Amino acid sequence: MSILISPDNNTGWGLCSAGMYGGAKRRSSQHPVRVRGHYRAPWGAYTRGVISRRTTVDDVIDSVVADAQRYTRPVATSTVDSVIDSVVANARRYAQRKRRLQRRRRRPTAAMTAARAVLRRAQRIGRRAMRRAAASASAGRARRQAARQAAAAIASMAQPRRGNIYWVRDASGVRVPVRSRPPRS
């Protein structure tokens, strides 16, 4: 008598009693059940010339599809909460930017204001000289003359002037520096 053992793919193979008990008719302590008498390849190892139609790309596609099927949308957040959060974040960012700007800005020293005034005056004189020269002479000579006059103005401004500086209140009551001595009243 032989027994049909059917694995999950139902190919099956027959075992007679001689194969089952090592040649004995019944099982005994001398003839225990024989589990495996030789190497057995795993199921699906020998396909008898049938070539697998699947590739590694198919596996990747299957995994992507499985991930997409398992995907659940995140719980919708309250729009009021999100608006409040964004307003708070923007306010913090604005405060940080303002703090950074305040740290960077320094009050100009007297030397800086004087240098700025010298530069402004030299530019004004240079522009005036350029206009004057352009009206009367050729452009090349005018440019050279204007440059010469501007250089002279800068040099004269750079030299320290003699004389005292007096602080006088103007019409609005603000104290301003003046070189000429105010009249005694």
UniProtKB/Swiss-Prot annotation:
Induction: Expressed in the late phase of the viral replicative cycle. It comes from Human adenovirus F serotype 40 (HAdV-40). Cleaved near the N-terminus by the viral protease during virion maturation to form the mature protein. The modification Phosphoserine is found at S172. Interacts with the core-capsid bridging protein; this interaction bridges the virus core to the capsid. Interacts with host NPM1; this interaction might play a role in placing the pre-histone-like nucleoprotein on the viral DNA or regulating viral gene expression. Interacts with host HMGB1; this interaction inhibits host immune response. The lineage of its organism: Viruses, Varidnaviria, Bamfordvirae, Preplasmiviricota, Tectiliviricetes. GO terms for cellular component: host cell; host cell nucleolus; viral capsid. Pfam families: Adeno_VII. Belongs to the adenoviridae histone-like nucleoprotein family. A motif (Nuclear localization signal) lies at residues 175-185. All late proteins expressed from the major late promoter are produced by alternative splicing and alternative polyadenylation of the same gene giving rise to non-overlapping ORFs. A leader sequence is present in the N-terminus of all these mRNAs and is recognized by the viral shutoff protein to provide expression although conventional translation via ribosome scanning from the cap has been shut off in the host cell. The keyword Protein biosynthesis does not apply. Keywords: Acetylation, DNA-binding, Host nucleus, Host-virus interaction, Late protein, Phosphoprotein, Viral penetration into host nucleus, Virion, Virus entry into host cell. This is Pre-histone-like nucleoprotein. The modification Phosphothreonine is found at T55.
